[in-house]
């Protein structure tokens, strides 16, 4: 397993989702095009500082948002961020709501997921990389870092952004949206939100011993709500314009909060758990 002690750390990696591909957050130091044993990441890595705090930005869907969810190279993205010295990951993701109380423009700090993907590489331990030998059975009872979840919640509160402290994300394969039957099924399963990117991203972060938390930005009610328009690209993009400004403010505050905390023991524990999950 890759260990953070082998490189300068612990930088904060920010994975931007739909509507957050801009680098205006940063004082940019450089832009690095890199390769990994799993191929090229979705975008260049943007190294820079946010109020003097070292961060690395990666655009999940590419600089021009031209990579569909199935084709995102999640393994390369996480591997590249780890190699760049990131042990802490803050991710943003646009999503639909499966529950009445989670309204468009609300934010949600995800704490669980339901995996409905079918076509993605979900582990680094596929026998192809000599650095990743064996089979990894990573525990997923609590996939997201609780301390980072609290950071995101605090950052939302500081900025007076409506945010819910927990939610179960249903990640579908996409790129199509759900049917009415699927949307209602996911609601019955206990799903709170629906998107196309949380899995396998959070799983892979755990395999690398990274602390990971995701800020979900609600854009719509999917297609289950009878008195609300069904999800479509036009309406999603309109809501994302509203969400984007709030998301940037929250990320700035979150980075500042993290910089004042000592997360090294948590990182070491995450790396130990990842290492102990590998059967050789």
Curated annotation (Swiss-Prot):
Q: Where in the cell is it found?
A: Cytoplasm; Nucleus
Positions bound to substrate: 196, 220-222
Task: List GO molecular-function terms, semicolon-separated.
Answer: S-methyl-5-thioadenosine phosphorylase activity
Enumerate the PROSITE patterns for this protein: PNP_MTAP_2 (PS01240)
Enzyme Commission no: 2.4.2.28
Q: Site Important for substrate specificity: which residues?
A: 178, 233
Q: Which GO terms describe its biological process?
A: L-methionine salvage from methylthioadenosine; purine ribonucleoside salvage
The pathway noted for it is:
Amino-acid biosynthesis; L-methionine biosynthesis via salvage pathway; S-methyl-5-thio-alpha-D-ribose 1-phosphate from S-methyl-5'-thioadenosine (phosphorylase route): step 1/1
Note the superkingdom of the native organism: Eukaryota
GO CC terms of this entry: cytosol; nucleus
**InterPro entries assigned to the protein according to its UniProt record, in alphabetical order:** MTAP, Nucleoside_phosphorylase_d, Nucleoside_phosphorylase_sf, Purine_phosphorylase-2_CS
Q: Which HAMAP family match?
A: MTAP (MF_01963)
Family membership: Belongs to the PNP/MTAP phosphorylase family. MTAP subfamily.
- What does the function comment of this entry state? Catalyzes the reversible phosphorylation of S-methyl-5'-thioadenosine (MTA) to adenine and 5-methylthioribose-1-phosphate. Involved in the breakdown of MTA, a major by-product of polyamine biosynthesis. Responsible for the first step in the methionine salvage pathway after MTA has been generated from S-adenosylmethionine. Has broad substrate specificity with 6-aminopurine nucleosides as preferred substrates.
Subunit details for this protein?
Homotrimer.
Protein name per UniProt: S-methyl-5'-thioadenosine phosphorylase
């Amino acid at each position: 397993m890759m260990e953070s002690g082998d490189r300068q750390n612990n930088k904060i990696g920010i994975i931007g989702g739909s509507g957050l591909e801009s680098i205006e957050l940063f004082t940019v130091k450089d832009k690095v095009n890199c390769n990994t044993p799993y191929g090229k990441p979705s975008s260049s890595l943007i190294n820079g500082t946010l109020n003097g705090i070292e961060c690395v930005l990666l655009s999940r869907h590419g600089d021009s948002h031209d990579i569909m969810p199935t084709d995102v190279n999640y393994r390369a993205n996480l591997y590249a961020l780890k190699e760049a010295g990131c042990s802490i990951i803050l991710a943003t993701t646009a999503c639909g709501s499966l529950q009445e109380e989670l309204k468009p423009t609300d934010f949600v700090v995800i704490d669980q997921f339901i995996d409905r993907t079918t076509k993605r590489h979900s582990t680094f331990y596929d026998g192809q990389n000599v650095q990743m030998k064996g089979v990894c059975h990573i525990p997923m009872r609590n996939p997201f870092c609780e301390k980072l979840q609290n950071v995101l919640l605090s950052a939302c509160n500081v900025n007076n952004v409506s945010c819910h402290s927990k939610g179960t994300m249903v990640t579908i394969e996409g790129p199509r949206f759900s049917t009415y039957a699927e949307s209602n099924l996911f609601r019955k399963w206990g799903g709170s939100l629906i998107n196309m990117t949380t899995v396998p991203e959070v799983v892979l972060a755990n395999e690398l011993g990274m602390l990971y938390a995701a800020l979900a930005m609600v854009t719509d009610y999917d297609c289950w709500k009878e008195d609300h328009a069904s999800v479509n690209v036009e309406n999603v993009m309109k809501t994302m314009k509203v969400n984007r400004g709030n998301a940037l403010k929250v990320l700035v505050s979150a980075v500042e909060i993290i910089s004042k905390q000592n997360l090294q023991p948590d990182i070491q524990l995450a790396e130990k758990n990842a290492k102990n999950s590998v059967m050789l």
